[in-house]
A protein has these predicted regions:
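Conserved lysine of the Walker
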Residues: 232
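Walker A (P-loop) ATP-phosphate-binding motif of ABC ATPase nucleotide-binding domains
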Residues: 221
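P-loop NTPase motor core
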Residues: 72-154
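Hydrophobic anchor at the beta1->P-loop junction of P-loop NTPases
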Residues: 224
Length: 244
């Protein structure tokens, strides 16, 4: 788990989190530190897959991102991508605190290359990102990922599932934490590639893994969008199946 803004304290002490996930929390303070840790953990491996089209056999080169030295890493968590992108953005500003026009393109390109790399990692990928309201000018709003630059417009293409966090009050007065899984004008990025989940579900990753198993996905890439305090970090506890 990469904790970019000390949100992991929601899950407990460092020792409690290590016991929960099997590894300690990683907390890089700069974008370059994050890249260094990722490069220490993973490597890119090129493999050739043979595919038959009728009587024709085609060689396809595939790039796979795998853990180094046979280390077992079942899941990678980034909390949050909003803060990670800001850490990189801070390295691009000049002495006046502003970015040049070409730097916005550099920001987009770097974040896209990072997303392409980490979404090739096998297993489960969970990325949390803060949300931001956009006024559409007709009295309606939509919720976007809080990422400066244009990455927020198409970030969902990298993921199998994109959920928005919501809270509702139950009849007994308790707060219930749910995920919005279906696309609407307001929840513009929401999606479920299995098309098996209801429009609203409790914030429980085991529900996602059930439909992933049914569809026989080989990996699971999940983006969670929501405001602070809406369950993004707390729900990470459900990555562990306590019944297994």
């Amino acid at each position: 788990m990469f904790d970019l803004e000390r949100g992991s304290q929601t899950l407990g002490s460092p020792n409690a989190i290590k016991e929960l996930f099997g590894y300690p929390v990683l907390a890089p303070t700069t974008f370059s530190q994050f890249k260094k840790i990722i490069s220490d953990l993973y490597t890119v491996q090129k493999t050739v897959h043979k595919t038959k089209i009728g009587n024709i056999e085609i060689d396809q080169e595939v790039l796979e991102t795998i853990p180094k030295n046979g280390t077992q890493i079942d899941a990678l968590i980034l909390d949050t991508f909003s803060e990670l992108s800001k850490k990189y953005q801070r390295s691009l500003v000049d002495k006046t605190g502003k970015m040049k026009i070409q730097d916005w393109g550099k920001l987009k390109n770097t974040l896209d290359m990072l997303l392409e790399f980490i979404t090739r990692i096998p297993g489960v990928l969970v990325i949390n990102v803060h949300s931001k309201l956009r006024d559409l000018g007709d009295g309606t709003t939509k919720i976007l990922p809080y990422i400066d630059g244009s990455t927020k417009e198409d970030i969902s293409k990298w993921f199998d599932f994109v959920f928005y966090t919501r809270t509702i009050e139950a009849p007994n007065g308790e707060t219930q934490y749910i995920w919005q899984t279906k696309h609407t004008e307001k929840y513009d990025h929401a999606k479920d590639r299995t098309n098996l989940l209801p429009a609203e579900i409790p914030q429980d990753f085991q529900l996602v893994f059930d439909v992933v198993k049914e569809k026989e996905f080989t990996s699971t890439k999940i983006l969670i969008i929501g405001s602070p305090g809406s369950g993004k970090t707390w729900s990470l506890k459900t990555l562990i199946n306590k019944e297994s």
